[in-house]
A protein has these predicted regions:
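Auxiliary Fe-S-binding modules of radical SAM enzymes
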Residues: 109, 115, 123-217
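Core AdoMet radical
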Residues: 1, 7-25, 43-70, 117
Protein backbone atom coordinates (compact mmCIF):
# COMPACT_ATOMS: atom_id res chain seq x y z
CA UNK A 1 0.00 0.00 0.00
CA UNK A 2 2.83 2.42 0.81
CA UNK A 3 4.40 1.75 -2.58
CA UNK A 4 1.15 2.50 -4.38
CA UNK A 5 0.60 5.69 -2.39
CA UNK A 6 4.12 6.90 -3.16
CA UNK A 7 3.67 6.12 -6.85
CA UNK A 8 0.48 8.18 -6.99
CA UNK A 9 2.20 11.41 -5.96
CA UNK A 10 1.85 13.90 -8.80
CA UNK A 11 4.98 14.27 -10.91
CA UNK A 12 6.85 11.38 -9.30
CA UNK A 13 9.49 9.77 -11.52
CA UNK A 14 10.83 6.99 -9.29
CA UNK A 15 10.26 5.23 -5.99
CA UNK A 16 13.41 4.59 -3.99
CA UNK A 17 13.72 1.87 -1.37
CA UNK A 18 16.53 2.43 1.11
CA UNK A 19 17.16 -0.80 2.97
CA UNK A 20 19.61 -3.36 4.27
CA UNK A 21 21.35 -5.52 1.66
CA UNK A 22 20.02 -8.68 3.31
CA UNK A 23 16.41 -7.56 2.98
CA UNK A 24 15.65 -8.19 -0.69
CA UNK A 25 15.39 -11.09 -3.10
CA UNK A 26 14.11 -11.63 -6.63
CA UNK A 27 10.53 -12.35 -5.54
CA UNK A 28 10.38 -9.15 -3.48
CA UNK A 29 11.74 -6.99 -6.29
CA UNK A 30 9.36 -8.57 -8.79
CA UNK A 31 6.43 -7.83 -6.48
CA UNK A 32 7.51 -4.19 -6.11
CA UNK A 33 7.83 -3.74 -9.87
CA UNK A 34 4.40 -5.24 -10.45
CA UNK A 35 2.93 -2.96 -7.80
CA UNK A 36 4.36 0.11 -9.54
CA UNK A 37 3.08 -1.12 -12.91
CA UNK A 38 -0.43 -1.15 -11.48
CA UNK A 39 -0.10 2.62 -11.09
CA UNK A 40 2.05 3.59 -14.07
CA UNK A 41 4.54 2.03 -16.47
CA UNK A 42 6.62 5.24 -16.40
CA UNK A 43 7.61 5.17 -12.71
CA UNK A 44 11.05 3.72 -12.06
CA UNK A 45 12.03 1.46 -9.17
CA UNK A 46 15.36 2.11 -7.42
CA UNK A 47 17.25 0.78 -4.41
CA UNK A 48 19.78 2.14 -1.95
CA UNK A 49 21.68 -0.37 0.17
CA UNK A 50 23.52 0.49 3.36
CA UNK A 51 26.95 -1.11 3.08
CA UNK A 52 28.77 1.47 5.28
CA UNK A 53 32.15 -0.31 5.10
CA UNK A 54 33.81 -3.23 3.35
CA UNK A 55 35.71 -4.19 6.52
CA UNK A 56 34.04 -7.34 7.87
CA UNK A 57 35.42 -6.83 11.38
CA UNK A 58 34.00 -3.32 11.50
CA UNK A 59 30.63 -4.52 10.23
CA UNK A 60 30.57 -7.04 13.06
CA UNK A 61 31.68 -4.45 15.62
CA UNK A 62 28.84 -2.08 14.72
CA UNK A 63 26.41 -5.03 14.73
CA UNK A 64 25.27 -4.69 11.13
CA UNK A 65 24.38 -8.40 11.05
CA UNK A 66 25.56 -8.73 7.45
CA UNK A 67 28.83 -8.85 5.56
CA UNK A 68 30.13 -7.77 2.18
CA UNK A 69 28.75 -10.89 0.48
CA UNK A 70 25.16 -9.89 1.23
CA UNK A 71 25.74 -6.45 -0.28
CA UNK A 72 27.25 -7.90 -3.45
CA UNK A 73 24.33 -10.32 -3.72
CA UNK A 74 21.81 -7.50 -3.28
CA UNK A 75 23.41 -5.37 -6.00
CA UNK A 76 23.66 -8.24 -8.47
CA UNK A 77 20.09 -9.31 -7.73
CA UNK A 78 18.70 -5.81 -8.23
CA UNK A 79 20.64 -5.33 -11.45
CA UNK A 80 18.89 -8.37 -12.94
CA UNK A 81 15.78 -6.19 -12.97
CA UNK A 82 17.53 -3.25 -14.65
CA UNK A 83 16.86 -0.89 -11.75
CA UNK A 84 19.04 1.87 -10.36
CA UNK A 85 21.18 0.82 -7.40
CA UNK A 86 22.92 3.05 -4.87
CA UNK A 87 25.05 2.56 -1.78
CA UNK A 88 25.56 4.34 1.53
CA UNK A 89 29.07 4.49 3.02
CA UNK A 90 30.34 5.77 6.37
CA UNK A 91 33.96 6.82 5.97
CA UNK A 92 34.99 7.32 9.60
CA UNK A 93 33.84 4.19 11.40
CA UNK A 94 36.13 3.31 14.32
CA UNK A 95 38.45 0.53 13.22
CA UNK A 96 38.41 1.47 9.55
CA UNK A 97 41.54 2.71 7.79
CA UNK A 98 42.18 4.74 4.67
CA UNK A 99 42.82 1.44 2.91
CA UNK A 100 39.29 0.31 3.79
CA UNK A 101 37.90 3.53 2.33
CA UNK A 102 39.82 3.05 -0.91
CA UNK A 103 38.74 -0.58 -1.17
CA UNK A 104 35.13 0.49 -0.66
CA UNK A 105 35.36 2.81 -3.67
CA UNK A 106 36.98 0.07 -5.73
CA UNK A 107 34.30 -2.49 -4.91
CA UNK A 108 31.45 -0.10 -5.69
CA UNK A 109 33.16 0.73 -8.98
CA UNK A 110 33.58 -2.95 -9.88
CA UNK A 111 29.91 -3.56 -9.13
CA UNK A 112 28.96 -0.52 -11.25
CA UNK A 113 26.49 0.91 -8.76
CA UNK A 114 24.68 3.98 -10.07
CA UNK A 115 25.20 6.33 -7.17
CA UNK A 116 26.69 6.63 -3.71
CA UNK A 117 25.95 8.70 -0.61
CA UNK A 118 28.73 9.37 1.90
CA UNK A 119 28.26 9.92 5.61
CA UNK A 120 30.24 10.62 8.74
CA UNK A 121 29.34 8.57 11.79
CA UNK A 122 27.01 10.24 14.27
CA UNK A 123 26.38 8.81 17.72
CA UNK A 124 22.97 8.79 19.38
CA UNK A 125 22.48 9.18 23.11
CA UNK A 126 21.83 6.00 25.10
CA UNK A 127 23.33 3.83 22.36
CA UNK A 128 26.08 1.24 22.75
CA UNK A 129 28.41 3.51 20.81
CA UNK A 130 27.55 6.47 23.05
CA UNK A 131 28.67 4.48 26.08
CA UNK A 132 31.89 3.42 24.38
CA UNK A 133 32.53 6.97 23.17
CA UNK A 134 32.06 8.49 26.62
CA UNK A 135 34.30 5.87 28.20
CA UNK A 136 37.03 6.40 25.62
CA UNK A 137 36.75 2.93 24.12
CA UNK A 138 36.37 4.31 20.61
CA UNK A 139 37.88 7.32 18.90
CA UNK A 140 36.48 9.37 16.06
CA UNK A 141 38.96 10.62 13.50
CA UNK A 142 39.44 14.36 13.04
CA UNK A 143 37.48 16.42 10.54
CA UNK A 144 40.68 16.84 8.55
CA UNK A 145 41.05 13.07 8.36
CA UNK A 146 37.43 12.68 7.22
CA UNK A 147 38.04 15.17 4.42
CA UNK A 148 41.15 13.22 3.43
CA UNK A 149 39.17 9.99 3.33
CA UNK A 150 36.43 11.52 1.19
CA UNK A 151 39.02 12.69 -1.31
CA UNK A 152 40.71 9.28 -1.41
CA UNK A 153 37.33 7.63 -1.89
CA UNK A 154 36.41 9.93 -4.76
CA UNK A 155 39.79 9.60 -6.46
CA UNK A 156 39.35 5.82 -6.55
CA UNK A 157 35.67 5.88 -7.53
CA UNK A 158 34.56 5.36 -11.11
CA UNK A 159 33.66 8.70 -12.73
CA UNK A 160 30.47 7.05 -13.98
CA UNK A 161 29.05 6.77 -10.44
CA UNK A 162 26.99 9.75 -9.30
CA UNK A 163 27.98 11.11 -5.89
CA UNK A 164 24.78 12.35 -4.29
CA UNK A 165 26.16 13.24 -0.86
CA UNK A 166 29.54 14.04 0.69
CA UNK A 167 28.40 14.37 4.30
CA UNK A 168 25.21 13.36 6.05
CA UNK A 169 22.96 15.23 8.48
CA UNK A 170 21.24 14.29 11.71
CA UNK A 171 19.27 16.21 14.34
CA UNK A 172 21.44 17.78 17.05
CA UNK A 173 18.93 16.76 19.68
CA UNK A 174 19.66 13.31 21.04
CA UNK A 175 23.22 13.00 19.72
CA UNK A 176 26.55 12.99 21.53
CA UNK A 177 28.62 13.36 18.36
CA UNK A 178 27.71 14.72 14.97
CA UNK A 179 29.89 16.19 12.23
CA UNK A 180 32.48 17.64 14.63
CA UNK A 181 29.94 20.30 15.63
CA UNK A 182 30.36 21.79 12.17
CA UNK A 183 27.50 22.61 9.75
CA UNK A 184 27.21 19.98 7.02
CA UNK A 185 27.38 22.57 4.25
CA UNK A 186 30.64 23.94 5.66
CA UNK A 187 32.20 20.47 5.57
CA UNK A 188 30.90 20.00 2.03
CA UNK A 189 32.54 23.25 0.94
CA UNK A 190 35.81 22.35 2.68
CA UNK A 191 35.94 19.09 0.73
CA UNK A 192 35.35 20.85 -2.59
CA UNK A 193 37.93 23.54 -1.77
CA UNK A 194 40.57 20.99 -0.82
CA UNK A 195 39.98 19.04 -4.03
CA UNK A 196 40.27 22.22 -6.09
CA UNK A 197 43.44 23.24 -4.25
CA UNK A 198 44.99 19.85 -5.05
CA UNK A 199 43.69 19.90 -8.61
CA UNK A 200 42.24 16.43 -8.05
CA UNK A 201 38.96 14.88 -9.13
CA UNK A 202 36.69 11.84 -8.99
CA UNK A 203 38.22 8.90 -10.82
CA UNK A 204 41.79 10.16 -10.77
CA UNK A 205 43.02 6.76 -9.54
CA UNK A 206 40.38 4.72 -11.36
CA UNK A 207 42.80 2.52 -13.28
CA UNK A 208 42.48 -0.88 -11.66
CA UNK A 209 39.70 -2.76 -13.49
CA UNK A 210 39.33 -4.69 -16.75
CA UNK A 211 42.57 -6.66 -16.64
CA UNK A 212 44.98 -3.97 -15.56
CA UNK A 213 47.84 -6.49 -15.29
CA UNK A 214 47.52 -7.56 -18.93
CA UNK A 215 50.01 -5.96 -21.30
CA UNK A 216 49.43 -7.91 -24.52
CA UNK A 217 45.67 -7.89 -24.82
Amino acid sequence: EYTKEAAKVEGIAAVYFSTRPDSINESYISELKNTLLEVSSEIELAFEFGLQTVNYKTLAEVNRQHGLAEFIDAVLTAKKFNVEVGAHMILNLPGDSREDVIEGARILSALEVNHVKLHALYIRKNSVFAKKYKEGEIEICSLEEYIERVILFLENLSPDIAVQRLIGRAPDDGTVFINWDTPWWEIHDLIIKEMNDRNTYQGRSFNYLKGKALTKF
